[in-house]
């Protein structure tokens, strides 16, 4: 396992506000995500603007692609994304097409685990070359009071055992990180916990301190 990264999720409804938060936090995070809401509002301009603003960061196009994997991957990676998300309900052919473009561009596909999916699905994604997935506690689940539980951790461990690296998101705070010490974590994704904090850079420092305390220098 490698040391987990810290990802800033930008689910703003306008690009100017997103770029304001990036200006505050880009030196404190490893990955900058053009979130689904931002991309639906601003289109490809969101990915292009973030690439220009953050030339040395990993940029994620969180598009949750369900079809047209090849065409949309060409758009995402052509705009400057390093990673693009595909929704878990997408046909395997869509995953394969998107992954093929990602490989040709030096990028990666992340499978977005919303709704219904199985470990057999995960094995299929791994078989066609995908190595990343995103494990969610969605906005609506958080609002209803759903917490991280043993069932979540067991599913994450099973995905890790298949060989997938997981980005974990859903109201994550630094205090939550010890729950995931046995998981193959690629990144912790925080949006409002970072951008909405009174002192965003301090919260980012707390994330990094907790990551270092749990995973340590041996994973650096």
Question: Predicted segment positions?
Answer:
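Glycine-rich beta-to-alpha transition loops that act as phosphate-gripper elements at the mouths
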Residues: 11-12, 61-70, 112-118, 165-175
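Conserved anion-binding
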Residues: 2-6, 68-163
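Conserved N-terminal beta1-alpha1 strand-loop-helix module at the mouth
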Residues: 1-70, 109, 195-197, 201-206, ...
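A C-terminal functional module that forms or caps the active site or interfaces directly
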Residues: 150-183, 187-189, 193-194
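Surface-exposed amphipathic alpha-helices with a cationic face
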Residues: 26, 47-54, 96-106, 126, ...
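Structural motif
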Residues: 27, 79, 128, 182-183
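C-terminal helical cap(s) of enzyme catalytic domains, especially alpha/beta-barrels
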Residues: 98, 149, 181-183, 193-220
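Short secondary-structure boundary segments
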Residues: 36, 88, 113, 137-138, ...
């Amino acid at each position: 396992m490698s040391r987990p990264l810290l990802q800033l999720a930008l689910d703003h409804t306008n690009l100017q506000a997103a770029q304001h938060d990036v200006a505050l936090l880009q030196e404190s995070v490893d990955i900058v995500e053009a979130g689904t809401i931002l991309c639906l509002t601003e289109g490809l301009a969101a990915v292009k603007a973030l690439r220009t603003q953050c030339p040395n960061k990993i940029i994620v196009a969180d598009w949750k692609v369900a079809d047209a994997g090849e065409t949309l991957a060409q758009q995402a990676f052509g705009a400057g994304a390093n990673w693009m998300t595909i929704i878990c309900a997408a046909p395997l052919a869509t995953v394969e097409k998107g992954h093929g473009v990602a490989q040709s561009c030096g990028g990666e596909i992340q499978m977005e685990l919303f709704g219904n999916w199985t470990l057999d699905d995960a094995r299929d994604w791994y078989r066609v070359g995908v190595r990343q997935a995103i494990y969610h506690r969605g906005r609506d689940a958080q609002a209803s009071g759903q917490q991280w539980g043993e069932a979540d951790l067991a599913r994450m461990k099973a995905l890790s055992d298949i060989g997938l690296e997981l980005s974990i998101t859903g109201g994550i705070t630094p205090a939550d990180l010890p729950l995931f010490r046995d998981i193959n974590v690629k990144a912790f994704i925080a949006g409002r916990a970072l951008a909405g904090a009174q002192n965003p850079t301090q919260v980012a420092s707390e994330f990094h301190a907790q990551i270092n305390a749990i995973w340590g220098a041996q994973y650096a």
